[in-house]
C-alpha cells in the first residue's frame, strides 16, 4: 500500500483546518502527517470535530490504511498568529518528510502552505518549497507547474521580483525547461506528443521588437530549434490572448509567476494543484497560501488539498 507524506506547513494558518476537514476523505493509502499534535487537537476543538490520528515515530510503523502523525515539533501555537516559531516548525516538518522520502520510506509527499516571510525569519534561505526541494536533491533542471482538469501551466521563473525576470530568461534555461516539460508531460501524464504553448515575456510578445527584444533574441530561436527536433511548440504567444485557446494545448510555459497563474487560478481556483517536475520523487501541494486571516474561522476550503492528495496518490502508483 502506498505511503503519502503530508507536511503540515505553517501551523498557525489554515493547514490544520484543511487537514482535519479532509481526514475522512483520505482513503486507499497510508497517510503520514508531519506536524504537531497540539495544534491539530486545538483546531479540532475549534471546529468541534473529533479527530482520530495514530501517533508514530517513523513511516515504517504504519502498516495499514489510515492516517498517522509524526509529532515533529509540538508547541502551543496560536491560530492565526504566525511568528518565528511557526516558521521554524514549517521547516522542521518539511525537512523530516524529505529525509524520509529520500530514504524510500514514502512514495510521495503533499506539502501544505508555508509562509515565506516566517520561514526566512527562522533561517530558511529558500523562496519556497520548489527551490528547497531542487537544492536538497541537487536537481538542476526543475519546473513548478500548476494544473487542473482544464489547464496546465509551468513557469520559467517562480518567486523572484518582476524586475529580475528578464535577466533570468536565457536560451539555455528556456531550452532545458521546455525539454523537461515535454518529457514530464509524456512520462507522468501519458501525453505521447504534448502540444505546448510558449508565452512571450513582453506585452504582445514584443510586437516585433517594438516592446522589447527578448522574444526575437531568445524565446523564438529556442522555440524554432526545438520544433526542428520534433517537439510540438507554438510561440512565442502574446499572453493576453493565449489563454483563450486553452483547449488547444496540453500545457503552457509562462515566463513568470503572475503571467501564468492568474489565468489558471481564475479558471480553476480551489481545484488547482502545484507539482514540482524534475525532482526524483513526487511532490504536490494545494494552490493557495497560509490564509492567516481566516485561520480558526472554520471557512477554509480543503478542495485543492484533496486534489493534491489525489494526484500524488495517482502518480505514486505509476512508479
Swiss-Prot record:
Cofactor note as given: Binds 1 divalent metal cation per subunit.
Pathway given in the UniProt record: Cofactor biosynthesis; pyridoxine 5'-phosphate biosynthesis; pyridoxine 5'-phosphate from D-erythrose 4-phosphate: step 4/5
Residues bound to substrate: 129-130, 265, 274, 283
Gene source species: Persephonella marina (strain DSM 14350 / EX-H1)
Protein name per Swiss-Prot or TrEMBL: 4-hydroxythreonine-4-phosphate dehydrogenase
Lineage, broadest ranks: Bacteria, Pseudomonadati, Aquificota, Aquificia, Aquificales
Cellular component aspect of the GO annotation: cytoplasm
EC number: 1.1.1.262
Function: Catalyzes the NAD(P)-dependent oxidation of 4-(phosphooxy)-L-threonine (HTP) into 2-amino-3-oxo-4-(phosphooxy)butyric acid which spontaneously decarboxylates to form 3-amino-2-oxopropyl phosphate (AHAP).
Family: Belongs to the PdxA family.
Amino acid at each position: 500500500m502506498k505511503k503519502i507524506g503530508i507536511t503540515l506547513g505553517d501551523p498557525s494558518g489554515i493547514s490544520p483546518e484543511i487537514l482535519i476537514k479532509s481526514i475522512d476523505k483520505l482513503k486507499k493509502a497510508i497517510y503520514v502527517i508531519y506536524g504537531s499534535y497540539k495544534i491539530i487537537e486545538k483546531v479540532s476543538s475549534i471546529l468541534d470535530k473529533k479527530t482520530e490520528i495514530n501517533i508514530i515515530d517513523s513511516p515504517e510503523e504504519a502498516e495499514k490504511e489510515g492516517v498517522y502523525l509524526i509529532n515533529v515539533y509540538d508547541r502551543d501555537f496560536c491560530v492565526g498568529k504566525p511568528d518565528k516559531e511557526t516558521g521554524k516548525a514549517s521547516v522542521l516538518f518539511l525537512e523530516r518528510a524529505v529525509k524520509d522520502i529520500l530514504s524510500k520510506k514514502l512514495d510521495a509527499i503533499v506539502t501544505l502552505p508555508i509562509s515565506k516571510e516566517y520561514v526566512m525569519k527562522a533561517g530558511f534561505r529558500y523562496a519556497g518549497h520548489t527551490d528547497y526541494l531542487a537544492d536538497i536533491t541537487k536537481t538542476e533542471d526543475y519546473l513548478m507547474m500548476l494544473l487542473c482538469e482544464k489547464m496546465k501551466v509551468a513557469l520559467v521563473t517562480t518567486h523572484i521580483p518582476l524586475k529580475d525576470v528578464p535577466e533570468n530568461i536565457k536560451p539555455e534555461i528556456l531550452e532545458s525547461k521546455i525539454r523537461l516539460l515535454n518529457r514530464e508531460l509524456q512520462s507522468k501524464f501519458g501525453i505521447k506528443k504534448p502540444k505546448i504553448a510558449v508565452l512571450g515575456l513582453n506585452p504582445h510578445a514584443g510586437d516585433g521588437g517594438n516592446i522589447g527584444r527578448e522574444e526575437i533574441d531568445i524565446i523564438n530561436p529556442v522555440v524554432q530549434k526545438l520544433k526542428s527536433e520534433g517537439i510540438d511548440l507554438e510561440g512565442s504567444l502574446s499572453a493576453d490572448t493565449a489563454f483563450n485557446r486553452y483547449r488547444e494545448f496540453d500545457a503552457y510555459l509562462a515566463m513568470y509567476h503572475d503571467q501564468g497563474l492568474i489565468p489558471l487560478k481564475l479558471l480553476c481556483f480551489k481545484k488547482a494543484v502545484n507539482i514540482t517536475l524534475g525532482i526524483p520523487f513526487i511532490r504536490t501541494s494545494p494552490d493557495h497560501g497560509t490564509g492567516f486571516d481566516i485561520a480558526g474561522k472554520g471557512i477554509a476550503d480543503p478542495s485543492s488539498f484533496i486534489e493534491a492528495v489525489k494526484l500524488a496518490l495517482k502518480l505514486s502508483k505509476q512508479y
